[in-house]
Amino acid sequence: MKEYKPQEIESKWQGVWSEKKVFETPQYSDKKKYYALVMFPYPSGTLHVGHVKNYVIGDIVARYKRMQGYNVLHPFGYDAFGLPAENAAIAHKIHPKKWTLDNINVIRGQIKKIGISYDWNREVITCTEDYYKWTQWVFLKLYEAGLAYKKPGAVNWCPSCQTVLANEQVKDGKCERCGTTVTMKYLEQWYFKITDYAEKLLEGLDRLPGWPEHVKTMQRNWIGKSTGAEVDFPVDGMDRKIRIFTTRPDTIYGVTFMAIAPESPLVMELVTEDKKKEVEEFLAKVALEDRFKRTSVEAKKEGVFLGRYAINPLTNEKIPIYVANYILYEYGTGAIMAVPAHDQRDYDFAKTYNLPIKQVIKPKDGEWNINERPYEEEGIMINSGPFDGLESSKGIEEVTKYIEEKGFGKKSVQYKLRDWLISRQRYWGAPIPIVYCEKCGIVPVPEKDLPVRLPENVEFLPTGQSPLTLSEEFKHTTCPKCGGPAHREVETMDTFVDSSWYFLRYVNPKLDDKPFESDDVNYWLPVDQYIGGVEHAVLHLLYSRFITKVLHDLGYLKFDEPFENLFTQGMIYKDGWKMSKSKGNVVSPDDMINKYGADTLRMYILFMAPPEKDAEWNDAGIDGVNRFIKRLWNNYYKILDIINSNDTKNENEFGKEEKNLRRKLHAMIKKIKEDIEGGFKFNTAIAGLMEFNNQLSDYLENTKSPNKKLLREIAEKVVLILSPFAPHMAEEMWHDLGKETLIVEEKWPEYDPEALKEDELTIVVQVNGKVRGKITVPADASEEEIKNRAVENAGKFLEGKTIVNTIYVKGKLVNIVIK
């Protein structure tokens, strides 16, 4: 019998696929298109099996769809700009470009060894000029549309990485890259106006039934739509108003102080001379605190009175104005009307500073002791002048209407979403295509002059300013408008800009006069199946949706959502932890391939758990899958020996065992298709293969003269089903079956409904609901015949009793009711 030698087989068939260009996708085809895409990786080093899971899931989908007759686009690339390359370059004294490209070469080799069916002709690398030229083009299109702008403001600053971070890149007050506590800094920065698309981004989520609900919820929460009112509170003794936003205008009669964020310019504008020193000391103290922790419900509430009062426009009461540590400058207007009776944080602050607590909402049923804790729910308005007795929902409406009529404010919709900060003070990123001219001001680089090349001979140690500042050659240029002296923008773009459109570039990766051909992109997009980690739910997915919508509105795309269906895979853990070099728990795919072969690795990754769930790597588990693969291989070659033997007995006749085994074969084919199409249940699909292999083993061991016709059908069907999961051994088996085609180009097998029909049925016999026996009847037996057989079978339990009713549940049981 032929021995299973995975490394030989895998190398052989990978060579054949490459030589015959099997996975190169034609741009157009009579076939229906299918775009299968996995999130491209950051090339930070070698892959571990946790990364491989993503690619194997994508490969099953691509291979399955190809076998179903689709024209499949299945590309790959690298998100190659970013801080880790720069930090590694600093640590190892190697240029980021070399470090990145060396890593890419290693990763590419690893992926090819796993047998992933990528069209390598479409590979994109975001740090190459032919890619970032078009990232710069995206920037210019947003700039022309008024969606890219520069403004000064407070930004998140990582002292270790020496760069600005978007809000989304701050986790619990720390840099998500290095874990350093984030501080505040005032800088002029470039932004994309994603807030203009807040409503479109929300609305689009309702048109994505193929996305997991939890991902859509995360995006909705991040966008954070709130409906309420903006209200102006005049400052007593000044020609100045403080505008606040509130979702609860029904509580306005309960305002007892105003609170302003420490970062707001209003603080120093309003503070009186006698309070200035105390306020400045407070601001200095708060600047050292974690902004995200200080604004949490649990954090200690602190502030300083500014020495001024505001006037409540509805009551004309004077209320003190404080700077308070629990107010975030970025949310709403950076100032709030504080209603301690109905907000926990305001309540805590009021208790600390002995401020009044005035109840203006009571529960619909019963009373509430406001001295014990605030009442934060909706209810009935009290102590609210003409609005007393109104339910909160009606009160919100009426108070808003009143302030609009009186000119105190207006109805307003606010979003938690802030504009996307894209400037980075680092080297390894796409240069921003802008020049500054003393005469013309800010001037965009013309499209014909792209790319603005990233110079290679640059000192990139972090100093707090962009390393490009130190490159005289890069910095000095001429103004595209007037031809006079000018200097380039020295900051680079956030790498999320690179990844916000890469799925478009795969369609025309080698096009040099435009980023993509509109007709081609509109044929292939949106992506039919996108696969990646849930950690990208907010950042990458939100930004990609935004850029797609902008390009749609500018007329470049006919679609406005990039990803039709989204699947988020679970992580692979080892020893209870996410795999990482620092924890020493990394499992290398190379080691597994050298020991077991790529097909075993693929099968184990898919078998260990439902693909959307996290799973624990287990060496005994991969051993078990390897044993199954060898048993399947041995059964297959036993079948080939039988088929190729001179024994002509039993060629056409199917006995009971043959019919039963064929039924199980077609039941497996049916189930595996349902498993793949019904939520990527690859683990249960493989379990189905294992179960059938056991049934096949029993047949081969216990049948003296196995049926060749049936075995030939089994050999063909099983290897076709195996093909997406273990493609190398499937190719070898297919070839040894005498086939001249490649199995990757074959059709997925369909089950035969006739084969699923039972010749006989086993019917459970019950008496008054208790099982009393079983009967075997012909599958075409009538109901009357089955009932009669059941009564006969249960004879001894019916003696001396009267049959009241006989109930037949088709194909399952007969229940005889007696008394």
UniProtKB/Swiss-Prot annotation:
Chief place where the protein resides: cytoplasm
Catalysis: reaction(s): tRNA(Leu) + L-leucine + ATP = L-leucyl-tRNA(Leu) + AMP + diphosphate
Transport is among the record's keywords: no
Pfam families referenced in this protein's UniProt entry, alphabetically: Anticodon_1, tRNA-synt_1, tRNA-synt_1_2, tRNA-synt_1g
Keywords for the protein's UniProt record, in alphabetical order: Aminoacyl-tRNA synthetase, ATP-binding, Cytoplasm, Ligase, Nucleotide-binding, Protein biosynthesis
A cellular component term, taken from the record's GO annotations: cytosol
GO biological process terms on file: leucyl-tRNA aminoacylation
Motif 'HIGH' region per UniProt: ranges: 41-51
Origin superkingdom: Bacteria
Record flagged with keyword Chloroplast: no
EC code(s) of this entry: 6.1.1.4
Binding site for ATP: 581
GO MF term (any one): aminoacyl-tRNA deacylase activity
UniProt-annotated location(s): Cytoplasm
Disulfide bonds: none
NCBIfam families: leuS_bact
Family statement drawn from the similarity comment of this UniProt entry: Belongs to the class-I aminoacyl-tRNA synthetase family.
Protein name, entry field: Leucine--tRNA ligase
Organism name: Fervidobacterium nodosum (strain ATCC 35602 / DSM 5306 / Rt17-B1)
